[in-house]
């Protein structure tokens, strides 16, 4: 399977929202993705595409020298195939080249697969937001990566 990672466009929004809806119990509304693509100067958004279909996406914000991973997801049938890893690698490498020195994100306490991937990149748990997710009161785990540089995962 040949996967191409490219900037998210307005034409991708319908497929991106579909990925979001099957991936998260609290998906972003379509207008949020439109804002990220057209109006948010801090936003960096990409999609992973295979055979003309969007199979994954990531939205990150570059805030001063900090890369904030806002959301990342792949279609269920494409999980555990390195798509999210490729998206995160691409996002971090791009933001490093734009001056990012560290990275942060939030992840559900129960999303162990995502936490495992983030740890492979060097992210460490830096805090917890109790009852953060409104649908079920689940905690958010805050993870951070200090001294961001091309490392063992981002160099793949």
Region spans (language model):
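Conserved G/P- and acidic residue-centered "switch" motifs that form tight phosphate/ATP-binding loops
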Residues: 82
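Well-formed, non-transmembrane alpha-helical positions, independent of function
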Residues: 15, 116-117
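Short glycine/proline-centered loop/turn elements that form peptide/ligand docking sites
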Residues: 88, 110-114, 131-136
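Acetyl-CoA-dependent GNAT
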Residues: 4-79, 88-98, 146-156
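Preference for well-ordered, secondary-structure-rich cores of eukaryotic proteins
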Residues: 74, 85-86, 102, 108, ...
């Amino acid at each position: 399977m040949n996967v191409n990672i490219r900037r998210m466009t307005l034409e991708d929004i319908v497929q991106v929202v579909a990925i979001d809806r099957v991936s998260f119990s609290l998906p972003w509304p379509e207008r949020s993705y439109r804002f990220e693509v057209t109006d948010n100067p801090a936003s960096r958004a990409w999609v992973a595409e295979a055979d003309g279909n969007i199979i994954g996406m990531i939205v990150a914000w570059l805030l001063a020298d900090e890369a904030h991973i806002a959301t990342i997801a792949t279609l269920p049938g494409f999980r555990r195939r390195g798509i999210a890893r490729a998206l995160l690698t691409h996002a971090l490498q791009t933001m490093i080249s734009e001056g990012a020195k560290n990275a942060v994100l939030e992840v559900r306490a129960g999303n162990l697969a995502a936490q495992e991937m983030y740890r492979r990149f060097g992210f460490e748990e830096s805090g917890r937001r109790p009852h953060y997710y409104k649908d079920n009161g689940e905690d958010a785990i805050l993870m951070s990566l200090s001294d961001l540089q091309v490392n063992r995962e981002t160099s793949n």
